[in-house]
Amino acid sequence: GAKELDGTLLNGKILLNLDTEDDDELSIGCAGGIDTNTSYSYQETSIHKEWEVLKIKLRGLLGGHSGMDINKGRGNANKWMARLLWELKQSNPVQLISFDGGSLRNAIPREATCRIAVANSEEAREKLLQTIANIKQEYIRIEPDHFFEIESVVSSGDAMNDSDCTKILNTLCAVHNGVFRMSPQIKDLVEASSSLARVIIHEGTFTTQSLQRSSVESTKSEVSMAIRSAFENMGATVEQGGDYPGWEPNRNSRILTLMEDLYKKLFNEPPHVKACHAGLECGILGKHLPGVEMISFGPNIRAAHSPDEKVQISSVQKFWSYLLETLKHIPQNA
């Protein structure tokens, strides 16, 4: 619906979006996004018969929304597993057999599993446990419930050749993940980010899915370019799509000034002026309505988009009176 809007049908210069879920909040911005999917065909080699095959599982990370939770310092299972393997490979002969991490493209990955073959199991386990201990100490206050499991398994099939293994682990460790830039306009707002959501290594193919977000279109292009460059540098095929625009905050818009003043007069306290690092319809609508000033507000809604969704009836009356007062004060020619 929003994507197919014909902007020529509307003449107004102010857009009131009635979709914010806290009645004391005025939303003035959101993030757009773009998906980056990569693929690389690697050379396979036989698993050394005398080497031991280990299965490493990482579980129990908090995960979360890769926009709203990206600034909370939570662990990314794909990045942790890549680090574990990279550090092991610096001192121990390793063959990488498989890797499966993450789930949804817009979620911070909570779990990852890989299988490797090692020449010296005792030395490899010692190095793995050392890196695991370092990670645990680094994230002790943020990720207290995560755990690694290492077990010996029987494995058939082939492993990745050594040069491709080095290339892929280097790329996974180097590619940006997390906050890319904070907003200079809105306190504590993430302006741009990237999340390495999915990594699969299986039977000759290495694929990844990541999502870049930004409320500023030029910055979204910058961060998506950085991710693209990292994977193209290793020879991977990169496809980017699903692009949707962000809504850049304008702290000096006339409608914001008006609604802030009205809120103070009506409710004897200032509203919370915020922007979010996730997608809202205003980002898409704004693309079709250049020059339009936008703001979003609404009654208290909880558990939105779930079977438990509910609205606080008392806040609907507050919201309604605020809406009517706002409409009264908007000039006829706006």
Region spans (language model):
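Zn-dependent metallopeptidase/amidohydrolase metal-coordination segment
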Residues: 184, 191-204, 211, 262, ...
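Active-site-adjacent substrate-binding region
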Residues: 76, 83-99, 241, 249-292
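A conserved active-site cap/scaffold subdomain adjacent to cofactor or substrate pockets
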Residues: 74-77, 105-182
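A structural supersecondary motif
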Residues: 91-104, 184-200
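A short beta-alpha structural unit
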Residues: 102-104, 115, 147-159, 195-199, ...
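A common structural junction motif
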Residues: 91-92, 129-140, 228-236
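His/Asp/Glu-rich mid-to-C-terminal helical/loop segments that flank catalytic regions of hydrolases
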Residues: 7, 74-91, 119-124, 163-173, ...
